[in-house]
Amino acid sequence: MNNSSGPIAVIKTKFGDIKIQLFPDVAPGHVENFVKLAQDGFYDGTTFHRVIPDFMIQGGDSNSKNEDRNTHGIGDPGYSIKAEFSKDLTHKRGILSMARGTDPNSAGSQFFIVVADSKFLDKQYSIFGEVIEGMEVADKIVDVKRDAKENPLEKITMKVTIRS
């Protein structure tokens, strides 16, 4: 899918930039939430705290700014948003989707980019964008050394900006 009507998110990392086309027509609440968090600087300084080869890279947890790695992956913005599952889109390589807890309506700020087709996630996680440039950056991130919790041993911080 290439929806050129939505905003573009740029995730800047030490490995380069990941440029993402957001899909407000597919998941308006998720796009609005992501854009607001990015514009408020919420994501700046957070890390990709969970990377799993042949699956995905996950970031957007405010706790990932902390040195205590045991808190990484459990942070949120203090609220959650309702799921918006797509009937038509699939979790193919390059898709941006929202992470959540066991409740489908528990997404907040954490997101992931799939680095390999992961159709088993379809209709369970809210797709709200797709990488249009910089997938090689995601591939570099997913290949870093990590601990037993899939948390990279080196900090991979991000700065997220939005272009209309």
Language-model regions, residue ranges each:
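Cyclophilin-like peptidyl-prolyl cis-trans isomerases
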Residues: M1-S164
